[in-house]
């Protein structure tokens, strides 16, 4: 049996996992409407020790954050896993499949915050529930915050293990080909409520 190109199968799965983690980071966003045109969610993984980076093109978010009252903050995010883009449609199609994200069965990865705590110097720890491919895990996302005029900007990276979420099944469980570690990265821009 011939396997799909390693890059095609591995990239999408890692990106999907990253998307879920990024959702966690987004949970630290603001009293605001998220500007998805200025915001990004991506996943970085390694295939045969070569970094692979993909972006989620579609996501929605509901956030409420005031840096003066971080404990009162909350966020919910949903990422369309079929929107994961590795820059090649054949790769994108592979990662949407059953062995990777199984987008037909599990169309969205979600994050719902449960607590936000200050971590010093514009940093926050955002705790919440990350769900990818039907598997839910408690996570803590380190998030940095800065005020940029009327906008609030949140950045962060959440490391996850793809196999914990059943991303990369069958022959793709082999972590010597596609690493288990995935970095979910996010840059979220939101405009304060008026």
Task: Give the ranges of each region predicted by the language model.
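Bacterial N-terminal signal peptides that target proteins for export
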Residues: 2-20
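Low-complexity, acidic/polar, glycine-enriched regions of mature
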Residues: 30-194
């Amino acid at each position: 049996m011939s396997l799909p190109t390693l890059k095609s199968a591995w990239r999408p799965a890692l990106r999907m996992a990253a998307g879920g983690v990024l959702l966690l980071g987004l949970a630290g966003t603001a009293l605001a409407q998220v500007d998805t045109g200025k915001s990004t969610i991506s996943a970085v993984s390694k295939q045969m020790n070569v970094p692979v980076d993909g972006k989620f093109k579609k996501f929605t978010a509901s956030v409420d954050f005031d840096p003066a009252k971080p404990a009162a903050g909350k966020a919910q995010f949903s990422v369309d896993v079929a929107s994961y883009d590795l820059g090649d449609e054949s790769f994108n199609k592979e990662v949407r499949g059953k062995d990777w994200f199984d987008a037909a069965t599990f169309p969205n990865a979600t994050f719902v915050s449960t607590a936000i705590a200050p971590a010093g110097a514009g940093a926050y720890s955002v705790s919440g529930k990350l769900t990818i491919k039907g598997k839910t895990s408690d996570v803590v996302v380190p998030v940095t915050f800065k005020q940029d005029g009327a906008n609030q900007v949140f950045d962060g990276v959440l490391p996850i293990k793809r196999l914990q979420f059943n991303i990369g099944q069958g022959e793709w469980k082999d972590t010597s080909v596609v690493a288990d570690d995935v970095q979910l990265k996010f840059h979220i821009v939101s405009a304060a409520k008026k």
